[in-house]
Amino acid sequence: MVNKFRLTNSTPVATPMVTGTTFSTADSLSTPTPVACMCRIPYVEVIGSVLWPVIVSWPDAASAVSILSQFMQNPRPAHWEALKHVIVYLGSTKDLWLTFSSQSKLTAEGFCNANWGGQKYCHSISCYLFHMGARAILWSLKKQHVVALTSTKAEYNVQTHVAKEGLWLCSFLQELHSTPDDPLIINCNNQGVITLAKDNKFHMHTKHIDMCYHFIHEVVEDGKIMVQYIPTGNNVSNIFTKPLAKAKFQELAELLGLHTITHKV
C-alpha cells in the first residue's frame, strides 16, 4: 500500500494517528469540488485492506482504523489524510512483530476500558483485550449500541462483554487441557465499576442500567471472574481509547507484546 499510494518518500511516523485528532460524524462535504475529489479516492478499499490485518495481527493500529472506518459512507479529505498517515505508520513499523514465547504460560488475563465522549459522537467505544503470557491474543473495539449517560455505565457495559468473551476463552483453554485454577482476572481502572460488579451497592443510583448488564455481577459472585483495579497508566487497553503521544503509545505497544525484529539476509 505504501508503494501503491506513492508514500515511499513520506517521513516515518511513530504513531498511527496524531495526538489529539478528533472527528465528528456530523462532518460533511459542503462544496462540489471536494465531493468530486473524494469520489476518486479509494477510501473504502483502503479501509478494507487494513481492517482484517488490524483484527488479527496489528492491535497497535486498531484504534485509528476503527475511528476512520466510521466515515466510509462520506469521507472528507481530512479522513483520507489520516488514513494515509496510518499506511505510513504501518510501513514505518514493518519490523514490529507480535511475538510469542514457547515458554509462555497458558494463563489468560483481561483488560478493559471505554472511550466515553472521547470523539465527537454520542456512543461510547468499548475497548478490551486479553493477554496470554504477557502477549495480546484477542482484542476488540466496538461502538456501544446505547448512549451511556456516565463513564461508569460505559465501562460497566464493557465489563459485561469482556466477561462473556473471557468465559469463552476459559472454555477454549479447557479444551486444550489447560484448566486455570484461579478465576479469570479482568483489569479495570474505574473503582466505581469494580465496586458495582462486586456488590451492586449503588443499586438506587444505577437502576437505569439494564439488568442484562448485571451478568458480570453474577459471574463475579460465582468466582469465575475476578475484577481488579489497575492504574490508568498501566491499563494496556488505553492504547485503544484515543490517539496517544509517542512515548505512552510505545510503552503500551510493548505491553501488547510488540517487539522489533530485524531479519538478516
Name the predicted role of every residue range:
Residues 1-265:
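Long, low-complexity, charge-biased intrinsically disordered regions
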